[in-house]
Amino acid sequence: MSKHKSHRIGQLAILLAVSEEPGIVEASILSSDYQSCIGRVGSMESNKIVAAIETAAKKNGFIREGVYREAHALYHAIIEALHGVTRGQVQLGSFQRTVGLRFAIVRGKPYKEEAEGEWIAVALYGTIGAPIKGQEHETIGLGINHI
Protein backbone atom coordinates (compact mmCIF):
# COMPACT_ATOMS: atom_id res chain seq x y z
CA MET A 1 0.00 0.00 0.00
CA SER A 2 1.05 3.55 -0.63
CA LYS A 3 2.76 5.54 2.16
CA HIS A 4 -0.10 7.99 2.37
CA LYS A 5 -3.17 8.61 0.23
CA SER A 6 -1.82 11.98 -0.94
CA HIS A 7 1.52 10.43 -1.94
CA ARG A 8 0.29 8.31 -4.84
CA ILE A 9 2.93 8.69 -7.52
CA GLY A 10 0.58 8.32 -10.51
CA GLN A 11 -2.00 10.69 -9.11
CA LEU A 12 0.68 13.30 -8.48
CA ALA A 13 2.01 12.91 -12.04
CA ILE A 14 -1.49 13.40 -13.48
CA LEU A 15 -2.19 16.42 -11.29
CA LEU A 16 1.13 17.95 -12.33
CA ALA A 17 0.45 17.36 -16.05
CA VAL A 18 -3.06 18.84 -15.99
CA SER A 19 -2.44 21.69 -13.55
CA GLU A 20 -2.55 25.28 -14.75
CA GLU A 21 -0.56 26.18 -11.60
CA PRO A 22 1.96 23.36 -11.13
CA GLY A 23 3.65 25.07 -8.16
CA ILE A 24 0.89 23.89 -5.82
CA VAL A 25 1.29 20.27 -6.92
CA GLU A 26 5.10 20.53 -6.86
CA ALA A 27 4.95 21.50 -3.17
CA SER A 28 3.04 18.29 -2.42
CA ILE A 29 5.55 16.30 -4.48
CA LEU A 30 8.51 17.77 -2.58
CA SER A 31 6.87 16.97 0.77
CA SER A 32 6.57 13.36 -0.43
CA ASP A 33 10.33 13.12 -1.14
CA TYR A 34 9.72 12.61 -4.85
CA GLN A 35 11.48 14.19 -7.83
CA SER A 36 9.38 15.78 -10.56
CA CYS A 37 9.65 17.69 -13.80
CA ILE A 38 7.25 18.95 -16.44
CA GLY A 39 7.54 19.75 -20.12
CA ARG A 40 5.71 20.08 -23.42
CA VAL A 41 5.93 18.20 -26.69
CA GLY A 42 3.98 18.23 -29.94
CA SER A 43 4.46 15.87 -32.84
CA MET A 44 2.99 13.51 -35.40
CA GLU A 45 5.71 10.98 -34.51
CA SER A 46 5.73 8.82 -31.36
CA ASN A 47 9.53 8.55 -31.36
CA LYS A 48 9.82 12.34 -31.00
CA ILE A 49 7.53 12.26 -27.97
CA VAL A 50 9.63 9.50 -26.38
CA ALA A 51 12.83 11.43 -27.17
CA ALA A 52 11.53 14.68 -25.63
CA ILE A 53 10.50 12.94 -22.40
CA GLU A 54 13.76 10.97 -22.23
CA THR A 55 15.77 14.18 -22.74
CA ALA A 56 13.87 15.92 -19.93
CA ALA A 57 14.41 12.91 -17.66
CA LYS A 58 18.17 12.88 -18.31
CA LYS A 59 18.49 16.66 -18.04
CA ASN A 60 16.70 16.64 -14.66
CA GLY A 61 18.61 13.66 -13.23
CA PHE A 62 15.74 11.15 -13.29
CA ILE A 63 17.80 8.54 -15.07
CA ARG A 64 21.54 8.16 -14.95
CA GLU A 65 23.65 7.69 -18.03
CA GLY A 66 24.67 4.06 -18.42
CA VAL A 67 22.13 2.68 -15.91
CA TYR A 68 20.04 0.44 -18.15
CA ARG A 69 17.27 -0.40 -15.65
CA GLU A 70 16.43 3.27 -15.11
CA ALA A 71 16.12 3.99 -18.84
CA HIS A 72 14.18 0.75 -19.34
CA ALA A 73 11.66 1.66 -16.61
CA LEU A 74 11.24 5.14 -18.11
CA TYR A 75 10.60 3.75 -21.61
CA HIS A 76 7.93 1.37 -20.30
CA ALA A 77 6.20 4.19 -18.41
CA ILE A 78 6.27 6.43 -21.51
CA ILE A 79 4.89 3.71 -23.81
CA GLU A 80 2.15 2.86 -21.30
CA ALA A 81 1.17 6.55 -21.13
CA LEU A 82 1.21 6.80 -24.95
CA HIS A 83 -1.16 3.83 -25.14
CA GLY A 84 -3.62 5.81 -23.04
CA VAL A 85 -3.25 8.96 -25.14
CA THR A 86 -3.65 7.09 -28.44
CA ARG A 87 -6.25 4.54 -27.24
CA GLY A 88 -3.90 1.64 -27.83
CA GLN A 89 -2.72 2.59 -31.34
CA VAL A 90 0.65 4.24 -30.69
CA GLN A 91 1.03 5.35 -34.33
CA LEU A 92 0.27 8.99 -34.96
CA GLY A 93 1.40 10.39 -38.32
CA SER A 94 0.61 7.20 -40.25
CA PHE A 95 -3.01 7.64 -39.06
CA GLN A 96 -2.94 11.39 -39.77
CA ARG A 97 -3.02 12.24 -36.07
CA THR A 98 -1.01 14.81 -34.18
CA VAL A 99 -0.66 15.53 -30.48
CA GLY A 100 0.15 18.56 -28.37
CA LEU A 101 0.99 17.36 -24.87
CA ARG A 102 2.18 18.47 -21.47
CA PHE A 103 4.10 15.77 -19.68
CA ALA A 104 5.06 15.18 -16.08
CA ILE A 105 7.60 12.73 -14.69
CA VAL A 106 7.56 11.77 -11.02
CA ARG A 107 10.11 9.42 -9.42
CA GLY A 108 10.27 8.16 -5.86
CA LYS A 109 9.44 5.50 -3.28
CA PRO A 110 5.64 5.37 -2.90
CA TYR A 111 5.53 2.34 -0.57
CA LYS A 112 6.24 1.97 3.13
CA GLU A 113 8.27 -1.20 2.55
CA GLU A 114 11.83 -0.17 1.57
CA ALA A 115 12.22 -3.36 -0.50
CA GLU A 116 9.57 -2.08 -2.95
CA GLY A 117 12.20 0.37 -4.20
CA GLU A 118 11.78 3.32 -6.52
CA TRP A 119 9.05 3.82 -9.09
CA ILE A 120 8.61 6.23 -11.98
CA ALA A 121 5.36 7.69 -13.35
CA VAL A 122 4.84 9.51 -16.64
CA ALA A 123 1.61 11.43 -17.25
CA LEU A 124 0.65 12.94 -20.60
CA TYR A 125 -2.18 15.43 -21.06
CA GLY A 126 -3.20 17.53 -24.03
CA THR A 127 -4.88 17.22 -27.39
CA ILE A 128 -4.95 14.65 -30.18
CA GLY A 129 -6.59 14.82 -33.58
CA ALA A 130 -6.25 15.44 -37.26
CA PRO A 131 -3.45 17.85 -38.16
CA ILE A 132 -6.07 20.58 -38.71
CA LYS A 133 -6.42 23.36 -36.15
CA GLY A 134 -9.63 23.00 -34.17
CA GLN A 135 -10.17 19.32 -35.04
CA GLU A 136 -8.53 17.90 -31.92
CA HIS A 137 -9.89 16.74 -28.56
CA GLU A 138 -8.49 16.24 -25.07
CA THR A 139 -6.56 13.12 -24.17
CA ILE A 140 -4.67 11.76 -21.17
CA GLY A 141 -2.37 8.83 -20.44
CA LEU A 142 -0.49 7.46 -17.44
CA GLY A 143 2.35 4.98 -17.20
CA ILE A 144 3.91 3.69 -13.98
CA ASN A 145 6.86 1.31 -13.69
CA HIS A 146 9.24 0.10 -11.01
CA ILE A 147 12.94 0.85 -11.37
UniProtKB/Swiss-Prot annotation:
Record-linked Gene3D superfamilies: Hut operon regulatory protein HutP (3.40.1510.10)
UniProt keywords (A-Z) are: Activator, Histidine metabolism, RNA-binding, Transcription, Transcription regulation
Keyword Transcription regulation assigned: yes
Q: Which organism is it from?
A: Halalkalibacterium halodurans (strain ATCC BAA-125 / DSM 18197 / FERM 7344 / JCM 9153 / C-125)
What binding partners and quaternary form does the record give?
A: Homohexamer.
What this chain does, per the record? Answer: Antiterminator that binds to cis-acting regulatory sequences on the mRNA in the presence of histidine, thereby suppressing transcription termination and activating the hut operon for histidine utilization.
**Is Membrane one of the keywords UniProt gives this record?**
no
Q: Which GO terms describe its biological process?
A: L-histidine metabolic process; positive regulation of gene expression
Which Pfam families does this UniProt record tie to the protein?
HutP
GO molecular function per UniProt: mRNA binding
Which domain of life does this protein belong to? Bacteria
Protein name per Swiss-Prot or TrEMBL: Hut operon positive regulatory protein
Q: What family classification does the UniProt entry report for this protein?
A: Belongs to the HutP family.
